[in-house]
Every structure is written in structure tokens, then in C-alpha cells.
């Protein structure tokens, strides 16, 4: 279960990340490359080169969590910037995890009647 609330920030680590990394390696990347504290309760999202796999790390003060999501088809929409972090809202994270373009979400038209 991912945390939600106004105090939680979601950071996308731009660029590609080696998806063989576990929590310690990803937390070290947050600390050294992004210059952020991986244990402050925020979510940090990483994407592999293929684009179909995401990893999210989060520390709640009692322990550390590593979440993984793989799309069966398609790719996760990812910012093109390199070597930094972009803050997004928890709602945008929900779009991202659903495979929806979180930068420009659009409501899908649904028919109201048949025929």
C-alpha cells in the first residue's frame, strides 16, 4: 500500500535506472544523485531502459518498502530530462502506475446507449 496525503511528495528519477537494483542501491542513488533523503517518507520512482518496469521506494520510519510494477504491454510515460528528479502529485502517480499519460490525462468517452 502506497501512502497518500498532502505531506507525501512523489519524485520521479529521470533517465534510466538499472532494474537489478534493490532498495539499498536505489536509496543510495536518491541520496547521491538526486541529493534527497530517501528515508524522509517521500516516494521515489525509477524506470528501466525498456520502459515496461517501474520500481518505487518508500520508507515509513519503521521500515523500507520496494514496490515493482511491470506493464504487460506498452511503456510507462517518462520525462525526457536526464540526471535529476521531477516532483509529481500522488494523483499523477496513480495515472503513471495505470499506464496513463500522467502529463496529459484525458477522460475517455463512453457510449451511453447501444444502436
Swiss-Prot record:
One Pfam family this sequence matches: TnpB_IS66
Domain of life where this protein originates: Bacteria
Annotated keywords: Plasmid
InterPro entries in UniProt: Transposase_IS66_Orf2
Family, similarity comment: Belongs to the transposase 34 family.
Protein name: Uncharacterized protein y4hO
Amino acid at each position: 500500500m502506497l501512502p497518500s496525503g498532502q505531506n507525501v511528495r512523489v519524485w520521479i528519477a529521470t533517465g534510466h535506472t538499472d532494474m537489478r537494483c534493490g532498495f539499498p542501491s536505489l536509496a543510495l542513488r536518491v541520496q547521491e544523485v538526486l541529493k534527497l533523503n530517501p528515508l524522509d517518507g517521500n516516494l521515489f520512482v525509477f524506470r528501466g531502459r525498456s520502459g515496461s518496469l517501474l520500481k518505487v521506494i518508500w520508507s515509513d520510519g519503521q521500515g523500507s518498502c520496494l514496490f515493482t510494477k511491470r506493464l504487460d504491454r506498452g511503456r510507462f510515460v517518462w520525462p525526457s530530462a536526464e540526471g535529476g528528479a521531477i516532483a509529481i502529485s500522488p494523483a499523477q502517480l496513480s495515472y503513471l502506475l495505470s499506464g496513463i499519460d500522467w502529463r496529459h490525462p484525458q477522460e475517455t468517452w463512453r457510449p451511453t446507449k447501444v444502436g
